[in-house]
């Protein structure tokens, strides 16, 4: 049985309004640390209380360990304790994940986002041992990232119940969308729950989630904060209205993919953070025109 208030559980380490931040690149393709620091500060000013660095939207598959850690150190140095920093440290290799998790802790991360091992399709016992091995190696909280659309294998509820018993495994970022299973886990464990899929931000809050880790927030952080504030105040009608208003952004993200959407949307808003690294590509001119219409329709 859980203890404490589910709505605030985990917020001290993972925040409540979070963004899976892009990694800015220069024209030559190298990482742009100055732009990364400036962008992080912008999102904090807009209302984020935590940021995920080196997550999927941060192009973790195509950035090296040194780049990831340099960005983490730079943002921590500039922003201090004004924002919770969640470091994406997961991979399909447990030993590499342990190494990256330890390095991220040393670089100043408040917590870790560890994705389910992808491509290799491990068993539930393998998934359990992967996460507990990582958690045993660090002293900061771990968030399990359950995203079967990318990892193929989901983290089953029974496995999450087992993982919840580990003192360092403190949260779940859910991109699976099983609200019924999630509610049961929120009710009967101490895991903090985060929506990892923007269309389900409001439904997950209603189910007892602590918050959300957004992609559309790259251009809609203020609106997401307004949604959260309205929900906390019991004004569900306003929260729902904001959620509906943001649907054009959700559709654009689904159409373009998270990285392409976020970087292109920022460019349209006057923040050029560089092109994605291959195999992710920039949108076509026609796609940019449609995205501009989507931003206008969403009021951002």
Curated annotation (Swiss-Prot):
Cystine connections: none
UniProt xrefs under InterPro entries: Aldolase_TIM, DapA, DapA-like, Schiff_base-form_aldolases_AS, Schiff_base-form_aldolases_CS
Localisation: Cytoplasm
Reaction(s) catalysed by this chain's protein: L-aspartate 4-semialdehyde + pyruvate = (2S,4S)-4-hydroxy-2,3,4,5-tetrahydrodipicolinate + H2O + H(+)
Site location (Part of a proton relay during catalysis): 56, 119
Record's keyword annotation contains Ribonucleoprotein: no
Domain of life: Bacteria
Residues the entry annotates as binding pyruvate: 57, 213
GO cellular component: cytosol
Keyword presence, ATP-binding: no
NCBIfam families membership: dapA
UniProt subunit comment: Homotetramer; dimer of dimers.
UniProt protein name: 4-hydroxy-tetrahydrodipicolinate synthase
Organism per entry: Corynebacterium jeikeium (strain K411)
Gene from which the chain derives: dapA
């Amino acid at each position: 049985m859980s203890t404490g208030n589910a709505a605030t559980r985990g917020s001290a380490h993972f925040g409540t309004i979070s963004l899976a931040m892009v990694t800015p690149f220069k024209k030559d393709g190298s990482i742009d640390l100055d732009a990364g620091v400036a962008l992080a500060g912008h999102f904090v000013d807009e209302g984020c209380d935590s940021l995920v660095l080196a997550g999927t939207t941060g192009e973790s598959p195509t950035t090296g360990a040194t780049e990831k850690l340099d960005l983490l150190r730079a943002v921590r140095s500039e922003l201090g304790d004004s924002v919770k920093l969640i470091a994406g440290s997961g991979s399909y290799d447990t030993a590499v994940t342990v190494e990256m998790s330890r390095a991220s802790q040393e670089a100043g991360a408040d917590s870790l986002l560890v994705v389910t091992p992808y491509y290799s399709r491990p068993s539930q016992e393998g998934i359990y041992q992967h996460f507990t091995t990582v958690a045993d190696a660090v002293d900061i909280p771990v968030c399990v990232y359950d995203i079967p659309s990318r990892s193929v294998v989901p983290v089953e509820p029974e496995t999450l119940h087992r993982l919840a018993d580990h003192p360092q495994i403190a949260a779940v970022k859910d991109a699976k969308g099983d609200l019924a299973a999630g509610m049961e886990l929120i009710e009967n464990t101490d895991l903090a729950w985060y929506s990892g899929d923007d269309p389900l931000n409001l439904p997950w809050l209603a189910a007892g989630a602590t918050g959300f880790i957004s992609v559309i927030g790259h251009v809609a952080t203020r609106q997401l904060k307004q949604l959260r504030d309205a929900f906390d105040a019991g004004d569900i009608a306003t929260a729902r209205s904001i959620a509906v208003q943001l649907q054009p952004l959700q559709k654009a993200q689904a159409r373009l993919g998270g990285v392409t959407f976020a970087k292109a949307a920022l460019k349209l808003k006057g923040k050029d953070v560089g092109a994605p690294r291959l195999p992710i590509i920039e949108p076509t001119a026609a796609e940019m025109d449609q995205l501009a219409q989507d931003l206008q329709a969403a009021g951002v």
